[in-house]
Regions:
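PLP-dependent amino-acid enzyme catalytic core
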Residues: 1-209
Length: 209
């Protein structure tokens, strides 16, 4: 099987940090650990950087010169994609809702991204405009690479299966076996990777979204 390519964007491994249960208002005596992907060192951090390491590697292998993606008004994907693309010399074209705030807009513009507005952040609305932007770029002679909202692709899920290998390895070094791993998300793609990685690397652990 052909190895899956990955570019280096973030600073990994990220810390596995224990947090006091009382500190976060947990009313039962449990040990809580957080996988600190917010500290991966590029943009605002977060889960999209791992996904983009695989997706942008795929874009470069395909000879693409630009990416087209988008996200909701509160999505971290737009900024993550903009700064990651800039680091690799790719143009970033971002579809965002009209309600997107100034911080996201300004960060994306500082990274050199081109912004396109739509009326709302529903996935079907975003994808329609993402495809339209990509089609326009092709007509101009560019080679765009489409990344759907949430970076929700098989490569995106693979990124978090690999993140679980990293996390469970860190836990094992400290003699810890987790009972549960909990993941929040919107599209379900990150959780798919978490569930797969848990099945592979810590089958005794229950995964919950």
């Amino acid at each position: 099987m052909k190895p899956v390519s990955r570019v280096s964007l973030g600073i990994f491994p990220t810390p596995l940090q224990e947090i006091s249960a009382e500190r976060v208002g947990c009313g039962v005596p449990v040990r809580l650990f957080f996988k600190r992907d917010d500290l991966c060192g590029i943009g605002f951090g977060g889960n999209k950087i791992r996904k983009l390491e695989y997706l942008l590697a795929d874009a470069l292998e395909r000879g693409c010169d630009s990416i087209v993606t988008g996200g909701g008004s509160q999505s971290n994907q737009t900024v993550a994609a903009a700064v990651s693309a800039a680091k690799l010399g790719l143009a970033a074209h971002l579809v965002i809702p009209e309600s997107t705030g100034p911080v996201t807009r300004n960060m994306a513009k500082l990274a050199g991204a081109f912004l396109y507005e739509v009326e709302n952040g529903q996935t079907n609305v975003l994808m329609k405009q993402i495809r339209a932007v990509a089609a326009g770029l092709k007509q101009e002679g560019h080679q765009p690479y489409i990344i759907p909202p949430g970076a929700s692709t098989p490569l995106g899920a693979l990124a978090y299966a690999e993140a679980m290998r990293e996390m469970y390895g860190q836990a094992a070094e400290r003699g810890i076996v987790f009972d549960h791993v909990i993941c929040c998300g919107a599209t379900g793609n990150t959780y798919a990777g978490v569930a797969l990685g848990t099945k592979l690397y810590s089958p005794r652990t229950k995964s919950t979204v």
